[in-house]
Amino acid sequence: MIYLHAIDPIAFSLGPVQVHWYGLMYLAAFFSAWALGRSRILRGRLPGVDMDGFSDLLFYGMLGVVLGGRIGYMLFYAFDTFLANPLILFKVWEGGMSFHGGLLGVLIACGLWTRRHRLHFFDVMDFVAPLVPLGLGFGRLGNFVGGELWGKFTQAGWGVIFPHAPELADWPPAQLQAQYAAGALDRFARHPSQLYEAALEGVVMFVVLWTFSMKPRARYAVSGLFALLYGVFRFIVEFVRVPDAPLGYLAFNWLTMGQILSLPLIGVGLVLLALSRRAPVLQPVVPAAAGVEAAK
């Protein structure tokens, strides 16, 4: 049944402060990463790192996600707007985050953390990779709740009518409800591409990566699988997702910026998987403190 999107993006208010679902999704993403990471730290899956060190790593990662995601969006998707008004970079409440920018931010932040702790960069990345997909899924759910990043038109029974889409943005809510009840809005239904990405980048990637990494794998393997899966899934979903308005299609009347940025990920993923065939396997070393905590 075609659904009319009518979700309030504001979860609740605390006096004058409005708490948005999108912000709560970020909290859920970071909490899931902490909970999953904690379980593996206690099992010694990142030798030499205790919970204090992991909390520090998570903080670095959070900064990388937020700063990299925002800067990446401005550079990849809204560069002209940024040049006209550089201060818009700090207006995060107006929306605009890029996964690829966030990924670069995380790589830089974790690289700094790794150098400080004198660990191999890809041992850390292999540890971090399985902690990420659930956060990606929560982020895409936030996009859906906010009614943004919608897909192309579809007549599939699971299509969603987004009132903020250009063709309906000027319609009064009462008129939308009346026309929807009469079945007159079905032609405006769109692919819920946010939910497709939540399922693929969130659920499927998490199940595959978490299961694959349950036993120690060769260095590069988990990171390579993450890059490959994300690149492929994002490239596929872009075919039913409306390209970002300022850019549109960049080539062949179908190639989007999201696909262009995903192609290098696919290549990097394949290279890392190839390198893993001759790489060492990092064996768990359970910290003494972790053993005591686990025993409790």
Curated annotation (Swiss-Prot):
Any Pfam family hit: LGT
GO CC annotation, single: plasma membrane
Binding-site positions, a 1,2-diacyl-sn-glycero-3-phospho-(1'-sn-glycerol): 140
Principal localisation: membrane
Gene Ontology MF: a single term: phosphatidylglycerol-prolipoprotein diacylglyceryl transferase activity
Role this protein plays: Catalyzes the transfer of the diacylglyceryl group from phosphatidylglycerol to the sulfhydryl group of the N-terminal cysteine of a prolipoprotein, the first step in the formation of mature lipoproteins.
Protein name: Phosphatidylglycerol--prolipoprotein diacylglyceryl transferase
